A protein has these predicted regions:
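A conserved FAD-binding loop/helix module that cradles the flavin
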Residues: 14-19, 24, 169-199
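FAD-site-proximal beta/loop scaffold in flavoenzymes
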Residues: 1-2, 101-176
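Cofactor-binding loop segments of dinucleotide-utilizing enzymes, especially the Rossmann-like FAD-
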Residues: 10, 33-37, 171
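Rossmann-like dinucleotide-binding cores of NAD(P)H-dependent redox enzymes
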Residues: 18-81, 200
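Flexible loop/turn segments at secondary-structure boundaries
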Residues: 13-17, 37-41, 81-83, 100-103, ...
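A conserved short coil-to-beta-strand element within the FAD-binding core of flavoproteins
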Residues: 76-89, 96-102
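Redox-cofactor binding/interface segments in oxidoreductases and associated redox assembly factors
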Residues: 7-8, 95, 127, 168
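Beta1/beta-strand and adjacent pyrophosphate-binding region of the FAD-binding site
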Residues: 1-11
Length: 200
């Protein structure tokens, strides 16, 4: 209540944090998103039936816009520093804009834009950083097949990957989703591992 709240992450969890901060009576809410603002309409590299990667305001952003007058998200931005005051409590954060560039391995990485630093008031920071896919280096090292979205290929209900004895579940298998799916799939994958190890 009465705090400037900064949420770091632009996904579903970040949206929930925006809505919760507003309902708890925050003074202001800002949502930091390292990715670019999506286009209003589908881009040519995002055809149907793929999930549409388009700009939308979810309930949290709509509530913030109704109260503050605008979408609380700040795109292409990352946090460089947390600054404290008396007693060691958070007082502000320092943000900087980023641009995405391909590194020498062809992987898109965020690069800070010099001269774009901004100090933002913040007495509360919530980390809600999103999921951009499973860690690829380990999967490549052991030869696990992935789909076009970089998720591990493993059929729902069986969880076995392309490598014998390796199983996958949750966000790693299905992509970013709800924790209830991760719990459900974790149990299913544990049962699949048990069947594999016991030879059933």
């Amino acid at each position: 209540e009465g705090k400037d709240v900064v949420i770091i992450g632009g996904g579903d969890t970040g949206t929930d944090c925006v809505g919760t901060a507003l309902r708890q009576g925050c003074r202001s809410v800002t949502q930091i998103e390292i990715m670019a603002r999506p286009p209003v309409e589908r881009a040519s590299d995002n055809p149907w039936p793929e999930w549409p990667r388009v700009y939308k305001m979810d309930y949290g952003q709509e509530e913030a816009a109704a109260r503050q007058g605008d979408d609380p998200r700040v795109y292409l931005t990352t946090v460089r520093k947390f600054a404290g005051g008396a007693g060691g409590n958070l007082e502000s954060i320092v943000t900087v804009e980023v641009k995405w560039q391909r590194n020498d391995k062809g992987i898109a990485v965020p690069v800070e834009v010099p001269g774009t630093e901004q100090v933002r008031p913040a007495q509360l920071a919530l980390l809600a950083m999103g999921f951009l896919g499973p860690e690829q280096s380990l999967l490549k090292d052991i030869g696990v097949a992935c789909d076009a979205r970089s998720n591990v290929q493993a059929e729902y209900g069986h969880y076995a990957t392309s490598v014998k004895g390796v199983f996958s579940a949750g966000d790693c298998r299905r992509g970013q989703s709800l924790v209830v799916w991760a719990i459900n799939e974790g149990r299913g994958a544990a049962a699949a591992c048990d069947r594999f190890l016991s030879g059933k």
